[in-house]
């Protein structure tokens, strides 16, 4: 079920399914700022990645001598969350452990996600509580898909990705199955802006490590108008779209990486 809030500057909609942001509009702006989740292209808007990011080796992990099937990006994005609190400018969703979660993730937990409007910004805060009697490993990430182009009549190639400062990050390499290989190579050396070209994502996502910038923005080259995402405090940030950039760009701060192709199936690996 969708819920809406507004503050005079922004109007936001979020869904109890996955606690997912699904619409963002600016007053007087050109229209929708998030991807439409067209199922023929990519059927999501801005899913949360919890309790893991990316893929697991062979699509499963092992814990306590038991095998757990594991799809991409965790379980929270595909579960119904409860609207636990709301106000004129915020929505708080809660996902608590139950029989369904324990069948997929063998720890007791709660995940609380708050989306709040602050001026021209959306602030999302996730709080994870371990309610089990043993330590719980987990990862957390965001997979926000920005509409690109966000101005009617423009093309994706009219946009660029801008960093807060000049960067020379390392790219965490993944294999054809989306698993980390352990290899890291330089990417965007000495650059503060990266033009969006049709072939930029022909090799899938670009996972960056070692960024010094506190934000990354999708910027319209001609006008300087932008959509900015904070990545401060996150060890990894990914850029991703489908080949050809068919209407969206994801900027994804992650605490965590996909499984390793050369390691075992324990989650801690």
Describe the role of every protein-language-model region.
Residues 84-91, 116-121, 150-154, 220, ...:
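A short, structured loop/turn motif at beta-sheet edges
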Residues 139-147:
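Histidine-centered catalytic micro-motifs
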Residues 225-269:
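Active-site pocket scaffolds in enzymes
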